[in-house]
Structure formats: C-alpha cells, structure tokens
C-alpha cells in the first residue's frame, strides 16, 4: 500500500488535493466495504447498492425514518468497526475498503486478515467544512471510477449550499439564535451552525465533552439540538427522549457530514427562522 495524491477539480472551478493511503486498483470495485456513515451516504449516490458488501453499522429498523440510507442498506452486512470480525468481511471478497483516517496507524492490528489480503484501502478524514464534503465526494468518485456522477453530485450540492447561504444572509444579526448540541461528540455541529446562522454556544469547548442538563441550564440556549440516531462505540441506538419539562425547544437532526447535511440545515432553519420561508 502506498501513498498517492488524488486531485479533484470541482465544478465551481476550485482545485483540491486529498492525500489518502490507497493501493492502486485499475478495476472498478464492486465489493466495497465502507465504515464511515457519511462516506456510505455519498457512495450510495455513486454506485449501485449491490456494489457495497459491508457497512459500518448494523441495521436498525427504527432508524429508517431518519437515516436516508438505512433502508437501502437493510440487506447489507454491517457492524461498527470495533465489533467487526474481519474474517467475515474477507468471505465477501471485498475489492475496496473505505476506513476513517484514525484507523490508518493501527489498521494492520485491527484488521489483520484484510491487511494480509492486501485489499485496496482508502483512509478518509471526516469532513468538517462544505469544501471538505465536496473534496470527499470527488475522492470517492475517483476510487470507484464514477467521476461523472461525483461531478454531478458536487454541482447539485454546491447549488443547495448557495441557496442556504442566500437564506442565511437574510438573518439579522440581532435575530440569530443560540444553540447547544446535546451529545458528547461536538466536532460536526459547528458546520451546521455556520451554514444555518445559529450560534453554537459550545464552539470553544473540546470536541468531546459531557453535556449535562446543568450545563445546558447554565448556557441557557434558545434551542437544544439532539441526534435522531446515535452511532458510537456502544453501537447504534435511538437516544432517550429529552426532558419533557425542559424549557428549551428541541430539534433533532442526523448530523452526518455528507450531501445530506443540507436536510439538517433546512430542518433547523425552517423551525428557528420561519420568517425566511414566508415569502
């Protein structure tokens, strides 16, 4: 496995490079393993469902209502990487593996059977900005040989981002609302805050922190944002409903940094800034 640089030329004229660990494969992959949910959501816009043989979560029927790809992956094997037996994946004859970049240093130890099989691997950093989402779409388009579909997806995503930005600019500064994400992993929420014009009261805190009712009461946000479905080292599960007596309005979103983040942004803006949609 060697390091190469993938160059992505974006439809709006921006050029990026994304360096990933990737073993070159001239054949179009059709037995893909993808662990990050956000990458799964992008891939399902680029390749047929039957080209994916393993995803980074088990099936959860209750999540079909919320996750745009849960129903699509119903018949696909899956588990969180912490609970994955790579010998089971090997039986599916994978020809491309998409992993989160934090596993790159320990990949051989975590997945010894896959490592010995020398299956092409892409280690991808989770996007934190709109531009990084676009870059990730192009990277996945490149490694799956679906560059044209990736270009079309990026162009559509960029148009939706521009529509959101036009709405965000209409929000008077004195009407921007404050918000707290009621979940310990905070790094993805700032992107949504930036795109919707809300003020993230936990922006200056660590990316991982315990969020308690006492902390929320101390910060007194205008709204509390919760996740529809949680996916972490404990598995996949629906979170407990918020405190019914809470004085703060609650909005639930998915918070996956893929093209579907647009849906999260509209969900928030329609509820907290309804005047933007009354024309």
Where in the sequence are the language-model features?
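Basic- and aromatic-lined ligand-binding clefts that recognize polyanionic substrates
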Residues: 28-47, 149-206
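Extracytoplasmic ligand-binding site segments that recognize negatively charged/polar headgroups
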Residues: 62, 105-109, 125-139, 172-194
């Amino acid at each position: 496995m060697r390091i190469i640089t993938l160059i992505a030329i974006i439809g709006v004229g921006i050029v990026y490079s994304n360096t990933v660990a990737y073993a070159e494969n001239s054949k179009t992959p059709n037995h893909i393993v993808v662990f990050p949910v956000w990458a799964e959501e992008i891939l399902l816009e680029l390749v047929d469902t039957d080209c994916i043989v393993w995803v980074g979560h088990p099936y959860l029927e209750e999540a079909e209502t919320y996750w745009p790809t849960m129903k699509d992956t119903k018949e696909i094997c899956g588990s969180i990487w912490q609970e994955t037996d790579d010998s089971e994946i090997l039986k599916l004859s994978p020809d491309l593996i998409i992993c989160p970049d934090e596993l790159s240093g320990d990949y051989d130890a975590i997945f010894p059977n896959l490592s010995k099989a020398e299956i092409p691997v892409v280690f991808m950093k989770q996007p934190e900005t709109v531009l990084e989402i676009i870059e990730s779409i192009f990277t996945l388009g490149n490694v799956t040989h679906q560059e044209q579909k990736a270009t079309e997806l990026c162009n559509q995503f960029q148009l939706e981002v521009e529509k959101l930005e036009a709405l965000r600019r209409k929000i008077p500064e004195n009407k921007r609302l404050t918000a707290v994400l009621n979940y310990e992993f905070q790094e993805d929420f700032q992107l949504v805050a930036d795109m919707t014009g809300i003020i993230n009261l936990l922006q200056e805190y660590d990316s991982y922190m315990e969020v308690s009712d006492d902390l929320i009461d101390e910060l007194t946000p205008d709204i509390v944002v919760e996740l529809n479905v949680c996916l972490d080292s404990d598995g996949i599960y629906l979170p407990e409903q918020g405190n019914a007596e809470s004085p703060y309005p609650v909005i639930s979103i998915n918070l996956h940094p893929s093209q579907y983040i647009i849906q999260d942004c509209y969900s928030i803006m329609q509820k907290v800034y309804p005047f933007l949609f009354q024309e």
